[in-house]
Amino acid sequence: MFVSATLPAALVAGVLASPAAAALSARQDPCTALGAGASSSLTYTFQLEVANASATDSAASGTLALMNGSSDGLWWLKEIQQNSTGTFSGWTLQSGALIPTPSSNDSGLVGSDMPVPLGSIIQFAVTNNGSANAGAGQTPYCAVSDAGGQAALAVNGDANSFAVCQAPSLDWVLVYAASSDNNGTYTFDTCEQHYIYLTQA
């Protein structure tokens, strides 16, 4: 009796530990739940462009650049109005990781995306030792197609909750699900909802 009761448990454990089960779970893409055309990877390098959600067209109003922004060494996505993109010249999306591409003269830097809680500024850890941050990749980013066929950025399964808000430094920073409860990192009354487009560089 004991043998027959343990056999099904052993079979289940064996199946779950098999390479086929591991491959199946590795192939599951969390972005597919967002509908047809959603993906956790793109084959091209792109710029992050912002478009005001209340505008009648989807024309970009600015570009986001990764800039050193906080006293704890984390870098923020900030809206810029000039052609320069700063230390990082573009972006890639690989298996849900949003990866900044260093400009050629700053090739030693590595940027790693960080978890994105509600009400927070979008942050990245940037190191100059060539190693990624251990906390990276915990929040999957996705590319989703909007009604016009443009690739838009989504995080936490949501492409509609990005906002550009003014920080105390007077920089305009990218925020996810802006909230008045933000410990003074940005001024909530300045926030405007934006879509983030992944425009091929």
Regions found by a protein language model. Give the residues of each.
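Compositionally biased, intrinsically disordered low-complexity segments
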Residues: T6, V15-S18, A53, N83, ...
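Fungal secretory targeting signals
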Residues: M1-D29
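Predominantly extracellular/secreted and cell-surface proteins with exposed
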Residues: W75-N133
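Extracellular glycan/ECM-engagement signal in secreted proteins
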Residues: L24-N68, F124-A201
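N-terminal, post-signal-peptide region of Sec/Tat-exported proteins
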Residues: A60-S84
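Detector for glycine-centered tight turns/loop "hinges" at secondary-structure junctions
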Residues: G69-G73, G96, L170
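Residue-level marker of intrinsically disordered, low-complexity segments enriched
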Residues: M1, A10-A13, S120, F124, ...
